[in-house]
């Protein structure tokens, strides 16, 4: 698992759903994720101002999607090796993208361009760019994702 070991210093509750059918943007997946969030928030004492969304690969694409579509549910987004939206017009949420220059499945360029677009718009947007890691070496993204912890703590101040 990537998120648990990388984000352990947050002392957070980590929820890691699987997509139904491979596309996070379907109504079925959106309903399932929002219901899961509602359930977890009802069961645990969670500060709703400190809920981040993160995911790897297709989960990274889902991170971009849920952060864009449900900004009231999340305070930050950390997509890892995920395809960003075509545009980030109107985006306000802090985002830290983790991506490899050597990703042969999800190219680096679109994520880099989206982060630059967000920065130009004044959004708290950062990128952790790594090299020498292919898309399929999930666990090798752990150290890069761990670097998001101080950033996230700063966002949550």
PLM regions: where:
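Gly/Ser-rich "nucleophile elbow"/oxyanion-hole loop immediately N-terminal to the catalytic nucleophile
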Residues: 23-58, 68-73
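C-terminal catalytic histidine-bearing segment of alpha/beta-hydrolase fold enzymes
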Residues: 94, 98, 104, 108-157
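Conserved serine/cysteine hydrolase catalytic core
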Residues: 84-92
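Hydrolases whose catalytic domains are alpha/beta-hydrolase-1, hotdog thioesterase
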Residues: 62-66
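Short amphipathic alpha-helix adjacent to the substrate-entry channel of hydrolases
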Residues: 1-15
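Short beta-to-alpha linker loops that shape the active-site pocket of alpha/beta-hydrolase fold enzymes
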Residues: 18-22, 82-83, 133
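A conserved short beta-strand
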Residues: 73-83
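Short beta-strand immediately N-terminal to the catalytic nucleophile in serine-hydrolase-like folds
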Residues: 53-55, 80, 98
